[in-house]
Amino acid sequence: MSLELWLSLFVICLLGAMSPGPSLATVTKHTLAGGRINGLAAAWAHSIGIGFYAFITVTGLAVVLHKSEALFSTISLCGAGYLAYLGYKSLTATDGIASTLEKGEAVSIKQSAKEGLLISLLSPKIALFFIALFSQFVAVGESAGAKVTVVMTPLIVDGLWYTFITLVLSSPIFLERLRNKGKLIDQISGVVLIALAIRVVWQNAEYL
């Protein structure tokens, strides 16, 4: 995998992790309710779920691409529609990323890890996002090393982002800064997701 392609993957994974949603709300709840350790437990358990989705998506898409290019393109186009929808939602969001930062009830570290894992494994949004995203980074004949990179990148990026969130929530100064930049994060995410959707449609125009 080229550096340019990996950087594209990295940026999309980062924006995906930064997108406000139930995952952020869950990690936030456990951080504010149980402290830094609970937040980290939820964050990295969540990233393991992300890694699992990445693995099965890479494997499944590789098989589909090998057997049917038309079917793969259809999946890609459906994914493009979903990416465009996510981008639109981000651009039209009335509140920024900080709107999900709410306090929850105290829970054990084990419960924090469990909820962090389940919120990623049971989210249709995450499954659809990976189908849309990985259609751009999976290719027939891709080396095992490249596939490992594709799987590990979202896992590590997700874990590090929510680790950052956990640490930020321990500092009122940085929390306020994040609140102030929340709308900007939404807008950047929206533009990038819509741009990626347009790219997918362009690459699969012959099947329209």
Specify the residue positions occupied by each region the protein language model found.
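Short, strongly hydrophobic alpha-helical membrane anchors
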Residues: 1-4, 207-208
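Juxtamembrane transmembrane-helix termini in multi-pass membrane transport proteins
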Residues: 3-73, 129-154, 163, 167
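Alpha-helical membrane-protein architecture signal
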Residues: 7, 11, 106-118, 148-149
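Membrane helix-loop-helix hairpins that form the core translocation module of multi-pass transporters
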Residues: 37-112, 198
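Selective transmembrane alpha-helices of multi-pass membrane proteins
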Residues: 67-98, 157-165, 176-208
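Selected transmembrane alpha-helices and immediately adjacent juxtamembrane segments
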Residues: 122-127
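Short, flexible, glycine-rich and Lys/Arg-enriched loop motifs at helix boundaries
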Residues: 170-175
